[in-house]
Every structure is written in structure tokens, then in C-alpha cells.
From Swiss-Prot:
Record-level GO BP terms: glycine biosynthetic process from serine; tetrahydrofolate interconversion
Name listed for the protein in its UniProt record: Serine hydroxymethyltransferase
Organism field: Listeria monocytogenes serotype 4a (strain HCC23)
Modified residues (N6-(pyridoxal phosphate)lysine): 226
InterPro entries with a match to the protein in the record: PyrdxlP-dep_Trfase (IPR015424), PyrdxlP-dep_Trfase_major (IPR015421), PyrdxlP-dep_Trfase_small (IPR015422), Ser_HO-MeTrfase (IPR001085), Ser_HO-MeTrfase-like (IPR049943), Ser_HO-MeTrfase_PLP_BS (IPR019798), SHMT-like_dom (IPR039429)
Record localization: Cytoplasm
């Protein structure tokens, strides 16, 4: 960042501070990851200068022959990665990917069945404060109160009762595997479209460690970061028959020019995900997640559903008499970054919450194995049991520093 340091020291200094934070902290926010240097290099390339409204071979601007190569690479790699007939890599985010799918087959006021936000769904799955809940008539399904897991019989009952035009599967805070084949059966029974939002688990799906929704869903959306370990962005996968309508929904429907530098970074990340090393990485994610859940429970910290099948888990703080807001703040002060999160049948506000969500994708990228993640689980437990004990917190902070120093991040930057 030689030029930035010279021309705009204020921005440069802020970036350096953030790099320092990422290096010094144990990053456990489930939606975050650390991209490779080559992904960042593609994002910072001259492609940021190019406008390219339209699609490869059908642009509304001249001079697109080279960005066409990049977008074709991204699309082809995405299709190979997930076994899809069609891929659109232009969505700027997962939310816009979801919006485009809704825009393609729904009319305002249509009924859609989606997962309750506090039970693990997402804002774009029908929250009343989101465009999805404003434009469409979303009805909810959730998890069982006893197991905190999806009960497909209850989903089926809701579908039969409400006769939705679309069913949305997928979650942002659900630690167990989702049976997309079962969702397909339910959708077929009521004549509904099935959209799967696999944003959080896309990397695990690509690695063959979670059921692939693409063969079952009419539409599959995802972000390209999180477990997929690419740049911040979105993507849509579908059957080839939807190509024309979905393309029009993205452009000119809800977006203008695509971000070609981000699409280049997506192509690089997809290329990385096609390598055997990525599968090994995702296998380590699963091992780390299970070990973290096991360690927390062994130290009297409640983990919802008793464990995890993916990269994240939810901690129920009610038995400890804590709120997510308080726990997040103190954990951050000792160098452990998590996010407060609602839990099923929540009694606190979304800004306070009764839980925290933790994910291991980023620390696994950093090189943490089961031995390291067990140490993390012990550190979290000590903080949660000693939220106001300054001596304990100071000791934890020192041990966090020792641990992060053992796993250097971006040493070349």
C-alpha cells in the first residue's frame, strides 16, 4: 500500500489498525473469514475501472472483451464447484441474490414460507424490517422448543396450511445439517418453488461435507465469503431454463454495472475451492467446530442442540445469567471476537439477546487445529464464568496474545 500511505495517511492508518486487530484477535464471527492474498490482489486490480453492464458477449459498453474472460471463468468455476447448470456471479451481496430470485417469480403480496429470524433464519427470509417482509406475505416456521432443531413435519404442516408460492430453506444461525431433499418433497406437495440460501455453508457444500441443495432447489443463493472464503459478494445457481429471467432480474432489474474486480476475486476463490486443499480445510472446520462445542460443554457452557454439524454453534447464556451484549463486549476486550445473537424462543431484544454465535471458519484458515481450538473453548468459558473478574480477564487476554502469535496472519502485508 505504498501509494495509499503516501497520499492518504488517514485511510492507510485505519487499514493498518484493522490489520493489527485481525492479527491480534481470535476471530469467531461465523460470517467472516480470511481471504488469500491472491483474492485481495484481484479485488485491488485495474478491473475496478471497467463498467460492464450486461453479460459476457452481450454488454452495453465497449472494451469488455477481457472482463468477459474473467466473468466466464467465475461462472464456469461456480457451476463446476456446485454441479449447477446456471450461475450468476453479479449479485453484490447475498441479500441482492435473494432479492433477485424473489423478483423473478413472486409478485408483491405473494405468500412465502421462511425460517423465523430468531430461530436461525435471515433478515431476507421475511423479517418485517426487511424488504422481504415488506413486499411479500412471509409466514414462518421454526425449530422445536425441546431439541432446537427443525422438525420437518411442522414445516410440512405450515406449508399445507398457508399454501406458499415459495419455500425458503437455509439459515444464518443454525448449527445442524438441513435436509434439502425433505424440503423439496414438501415444496412439491404444495406446488411451491424452493429457494435455498446456503450462504453460511457454501464452502462445506462445495467440499462435499453437507448435502448439496442445487439438485433439489429451483434456486440456490449464496454469499461468496463465509465458508467459501472468497470476497464479499453474492451468487445465484439454478437450472439453465431460468437463465434469461434471472439475468434480467439482476440487470436491469435490481442492479446496474457489475463489480468486475469483485467478480475476478470470486473467480480466484472458486478456483481455490476446486483444489483438494480446500476440502481438507473444510474437514478441519468440522473437527474444530465439534471440538469447540465439546470443550464449552465440558466447562459448563450451554451449547444449543448439544453441538454442531457445520462451522458455527450457538451459546445459550441464560443459564449463566448473562446477555449476549455483555458477553460480546467483554470477550472483545480480551481479544475474542464474537457476535451477540438471538436464540430460539428469545426473551431479550435483538440488540441485547440471550446468546452469542461463534464460528470457526476464520481461525481454521489461520491454522488452528483441535488442540488450539480446545484452548479457545477454555478461554471463552473462563470469560463467561468470570465476566467481572479483572484478574482472570487480564490472564485470558495474555493467553489470547500468546495463541494468536503462534498463528501469524498475513505475514507478507
Amino acid at each position: 500500500m505504498v501509494y495509499l500511505q503516501k497520499q492518504d495517511k488517514e485511510v492507510f492508518d485505519a487499514i493498518k489498525l484493522e490489520l493489527g486487530r485481525q492479527r491480534a484477535n481470535i476471530e469467531l464471527i461465523a460470517s467472516e473469514n480470511f481471504v488469500s492474498e491472491q483474492v485481495m490482489e484481484a479485488m485491488g486490480s485495474v478491473l475496478t475501472n471497467k463498467y460492464a453492464e450486461g453479460y459476457p458477449g452481450k454488454r452495453y459498453y465497449g472494451g469488455c472483451e477481457f472482463v468477459d474472460i474473467v466473468e466466464d471463468l467465475a461462472r464456469d468455476r461456480a457451476k463446476k464447484l456446485f454441479g449447477a447448470e446456471y450461475a450468476n456471479v453479479q449479485p453484490h451481496s447475498g441479500a441482492q441474490a435473494n432479492m433477485a430470485v424473489y423478483h423473478t417469480v413472486l409478485e408483491p403480496g405473494d405468500t412465502v414460507l421462511g425460517m423465523n429470524l430468531s430461530h436461525g433464519g435471515h433478515l431476507t427470509h421475511g423479517s418485517p424490517v426487511n424488504f422481504s417482509g415488506v413486499l411479500y406475505n412471509f409466514v414462518e416456521y421454526g425449530v422445536r422448543e425441546d431439541t432446537k432443531e427443525i422438525d420437518y413435519d411442522i414445516v410440512r404442516e405450515a406449508a399445507l396450511k398457508h399454501k406458499p408460492k415459495m419455500i425458503v430453506a437455509g439459515a444464518s444461525a443454525y448449527p445442524r445439517k438441513i435436509d434439502f431433499a425433505k424440503f423439496r418433497e414438501i415444496a412439491d406437495e404444495v406446488g411451491a418453488y424452493l429457494m435455498v440460501d446456503m450462504a453460511h455453508i457454501a464452502g462445506l457444500v462445495a467440499a462435499g461435507l453437507h448435502q448439496n441443495p442445487v439438485p433439489y432447489a429451483d434456486f440456490t443463493t449464496t454469499t461468496t465469503h463465509k465458508t467459501l472464503r472468497g470476497p464479499r459478494g453474492g451468487m445465484i445457481l439454478a437450472k439453465a431454463e431460468w437463465e434469461q429471467k434471472l439475468n434480467k432480474s439482476i440487470f436491469p432489474g435490481i442492479q446496474g454495472g457489475p463489480l468486475m474486480h469483485v467478480i475476478a476475486a470470486k473467480a480466484v476463490a472458486f478456483g481455490e475451492a476446486l483444489q483438494p486443499e480446500f476440502t481438507a480445510y473444510c474437514e478441519q472446520i468440522i473437527r474444530n467446530s465439534k471440538k469447540l462445542a465439546e470443550t464449552l460443554q465440558a466447562n459448563d457452557v450451554a451449547v444449543l442442540t448439544g453441538g454442531s454439524d457445520n462451522h458455527l454453534l450457538l451459546i445459550d447464556l441464560k443459564p449463566l445469567g448473562l446477555t449476549g451484549k455483555a458477553a460480546e463486549k467483554v470477550l472483545d476486550e480480551v481479544g475474542i471476537t464474537v457476535n451477540k445473537n438471538t436464540i430460539p424462543f428469545e426473551t431479550e431484544s435483538p440488540f441485547v439477546t440471550s446468546g452469542i454465535r461463534v464460528g470457526v471458519a476464520a481461525v481454521t484458515t489461520r491454522g488452528f487445529d483441535e488442540v488450539a481450538i480446545e484452548k479457545v473453548g477454555v478461554l471463552i468459558s473462563e470469560v463467561l464464568h468470570n465476566l467481572e473478574n479483572e484478574e482472570v480477564l487480564a490472564d485470558v487476554k495474555a493467553r489470547v496474545a500468546t495463541l494468536t502469535n503462534e498463528y501469524p496472519l498475513y505475514p507478507s502485508l
